[in-house]
Design a protein with these regions (language model features):
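Cofactor-binding loop segments of dinucleotide-utilizing enzymes, especially the Rossmann-like FAD-
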Residues: 25-27, 97, 164
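Core dinuclear metal-dependent hydrolase active-site scaffold
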Residues: 49-111
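Active-site metal-binding motif and surrounding structural segment of the metallo-beta-lactamase
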Residues: 1-23, 114-116
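Cap/insert and terminal regions of metallo-dependent hydrolase folds
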Residues: 89-91, 99-168
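A short alpha->loop->secondary-structure connector
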Residues: 13-18, 38-50
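A structural micro-motif
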Residues: 20, 45-47, 64, 90, ...
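A short, active-site helix/loop in glycosyltransferases that binds the activated sugar's phosphate group
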Residues: 27-37
Length: 168
């Protein structure tokens, strides 16, 4: 279930928002504007699309900025991104979805060490979590794999697993 599905709650049937900023990469912007019910949110001005570009910092206000960066994932309808969130004195890395760390052209340990907090994909704990399912069809790094990669790190308390599913 794509993360974008929750946007429908901004529409007139639920919240009835007005010009709520929605930050989106190019392919997601096109998808939202071209497909209902999301296109209705744009038409009725429930949401206002704000464009994002890979590795381009966006200031949300005087104190907080975000930088989206592409990560390898299924990308059926749009790009998949993580975010670096920066405040006046702290930074956070947010990667809720990624296929496998080995497919990414970055060093996970280095990224985690460069930030104060890391919120990373914890969708599945291990290979056998969904008996009878081909886990390659729903790719995510297993928590045990991520813990193994991060084993050499000294400060592990800055890592928090998110995007948990109903089985873990």
């Amino acid at each position: 279930i794509g993360h974008y599905s929750g946007l429908i709650h901004f529409g007139r049937e639920v919240m009835g928002n007005k010009n709520t900023p929605v930050y989106a990469m190019p392919k997601m912007t096109k998808f939202i504007k071209s497909n209902g019910p999301w296109s209705q949110l744009v038409k009725l001005k429930n949401i206002k699309i704000k464009s994002l570009k890979n590795d381009k910092k966006v200031k949300l206000n005087k104190r907080i900025s975000i930088t989206p960066f592409l990560v390898p994932h299924r990308d059926e309808f749009s790009e998949t991104v993580g975010f670096k969130v920066e405040g006046p004195s702290k930074s956070l890395i947010y990667i809720p979805d990624i296929d496998k760390w080995q497919k990414w052209d970055n060093d996970l340990i280095k990224i985690v060490e460069e930030n104060d907090y890391s919120l990373i994909d914890g969708t599945f704990a291990e290979q056998d979590e969904l008996p009878g399912r081909d886990m390659s069809k729903i790719p995510h790094p297993f928590i045990v794999e991520t813990m193994d990669i991060l084993k050499p790190m000294k400060e592990k308390s800055k890592v928090h697993f998110i995007h948990l599913n109903h089985t873990n």
